[in-house]
């Protein structure tokens, strides 16, 4: 929310981009945040202690500081490009291991956390859109910077290298988070190895969207075989009417089913 509203809308003062940034910011604070807050309410975690706990967790606190440091600069075209490129990867890769972990409870015959799965689908669809929009901003600005001669070939190479290095840092961060998920042992139906390779695939997608080549190319990625199915497919809302998207389903219609 803060990045779209306070960075993108100020750095890109075009009305159409500002409308996009405002819409994305609203989705984060007006749709996703209430959903996750509702989960916390059901779990009894909607309290100040829980919402500030990340500050006392060295791993999570360092990640938040790293993100803030990497995307805050706006003094040059180069730094704006780097910021938007990194943020596009953050939107398209960070949290996806958590998305996959939660979604697996509703796959492969488990059929648990139905409401949570629906909300995660909304988040994954929106985060993917936000990532792709950020990548479009990056490519457009880079093309214009090249045409206007405000970025050199050497800077273009450096930019690519910095963004590729960032994917490796993101993977390291995600690996630590994934390790926390399995601190108390293995979980039937999903593994840390599967989640790591899924994050690698997400980072490759982000690089491709930015106009760069893949660097991870995981050959073992079973999560992808089921993760995207209910994100991309239509569902039958009414046998006698038509098909539509589950995105229109309201998770507040009923109680959470575990």
Q: What are the residue ranges of the model-derived segments?
A:
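Non-heme di-metal
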Residues: 1-258
């Amino acid at each position: 929310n803060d990045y779209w509203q306070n960075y993108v809308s100020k750095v890109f003062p075009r009305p159409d981009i500002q409308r996009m940034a405002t819409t994305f910011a609203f989705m984060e604070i007006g749709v996703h945040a209430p959903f996750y807050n509702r989960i916390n309410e059901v779990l009894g975690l909607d309290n100040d202690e829980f919402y500030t706990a990340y500050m006392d967790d060295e791993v999570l606190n360092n990640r938040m500081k790293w993100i803030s440091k990497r995307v805050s600069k706006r003094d040059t075209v180069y730094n704006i490009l780097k910021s938007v490129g990194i943020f596009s990867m953050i939107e398209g890769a960070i949290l996806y291991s958590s998305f996959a972990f939660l979604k697996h409870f509703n796959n492969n015959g488990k059929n648990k956390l139905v409401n949570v799965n629906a909300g995660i689908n909304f988040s994954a669809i929106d985060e993917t859109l936000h990532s792709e929009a950020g990548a479009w901003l990056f490519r457009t600005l880079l093309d214009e910077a090249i045409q206007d001669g405000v970025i050199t070939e050497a800077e273009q190479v450096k930019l690519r290298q910095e963004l590729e290095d960032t994917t490796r840092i993101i993977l390291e961060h995600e690996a630590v988070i994934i390790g926390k998920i399995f601190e108390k042992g293995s979980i039937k139906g999903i593994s840390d190895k599967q989640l790591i390779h899924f994050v690698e695939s997400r980072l490759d997608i982000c690089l491709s969207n930015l106009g760069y080549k893949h660097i991870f190319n995981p050959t073992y990625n079973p999560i992808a075989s089921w993760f995207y199915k209910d994100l991309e497919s239509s569902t039958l809302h009414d046998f006698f009417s038509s098909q539509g998207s589950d995105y229109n389903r309201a998770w507040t219609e009923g109680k959470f089913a575990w």
